[in-house]
């Protein structure tokens, strides 16, 4: 298994970032996201908002992987919990197909910065595990690990894009 961890900060309050996070699709930095459909949404007894979405992504695959896969779409399950009382957004995202090639999992935690509550801290943990043998699994994991930081930057730019879009309406 390959692991990537990142800690970063948004120069915006948690309330704005969590709202933009829920509305982040579509945006110009996520053209690979074909659709984002809410499967379930509810508020639990503690007042936390739970959301489960199905994302359909279409992206490029390396040539050596395209021979293993016959499709270019991937189905992703995204679960999130927004706790306005604790000012915390937790999310987990993982693929539900192509599991014979790769299991990709991403976990995020958004909360106000401890140094400056007008900013939002984000902690990201990504894990990539491939069951393939003969060195192919390591190759798949290495490819994902190499591309993930670039994808993370695009994801965060998308949130900022949505944040700016909504600011222009106010």
Report residues per predicted region.
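Hydrophobic ligand-binding cavity/cleft-lining segments
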Residues: 1-61
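Generic detector of isolated residues embedded in canonical secondary-structure elements
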Residues: 15-16, 79, 123
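Terminal "cap-and-tail" regions of soluble proteins that handle hydrophobic small molecules
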Residues: 2-7, 64-72, 83-170
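Glycine-rich portal/gate segments that line the openings of hydrophobic small-molecule binding cavities
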Residues: 39-93
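Short edge beta-strand segments in beta-sheet-rich domains
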Residues: 33, 75-77, 105
């Amino acid at each position: 298994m390959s692991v990537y961890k990142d800690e970063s900060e948004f120069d915006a309050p948690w309330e704005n970032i969590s709202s933009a996070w829920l509305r982040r699709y579509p945006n110009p930095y996520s053209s690979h996201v074909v659709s984002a459909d809410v499967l379930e949404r509810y508020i639990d007894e503690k007042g936390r908002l739970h959301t489960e979405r199905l994302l359909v992504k279409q992206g490029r695959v390396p040539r050596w992987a395209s021979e293993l896969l016959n499709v270019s779409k991937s189905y992703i399950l995204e679960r999130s919990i927004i706790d306005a009382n604790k000012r915390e957004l937790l999310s987990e995202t993982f693929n539900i197909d192509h599991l014979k090639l790769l299991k990709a999992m991403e976990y995020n935690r958004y909360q106000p910065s401890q140094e400056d509550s007008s900013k939002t801290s984000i902690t990201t943990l990504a894990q990539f595990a491939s069951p393939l043998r003969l060195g192919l699994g390591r190759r798949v994991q290495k490819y994902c690990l190499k591309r993930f930081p670039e994808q993370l930057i695009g994801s965060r730019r998308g949130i900022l894009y949505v944040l700016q879009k909504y600011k222009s309406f106010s």
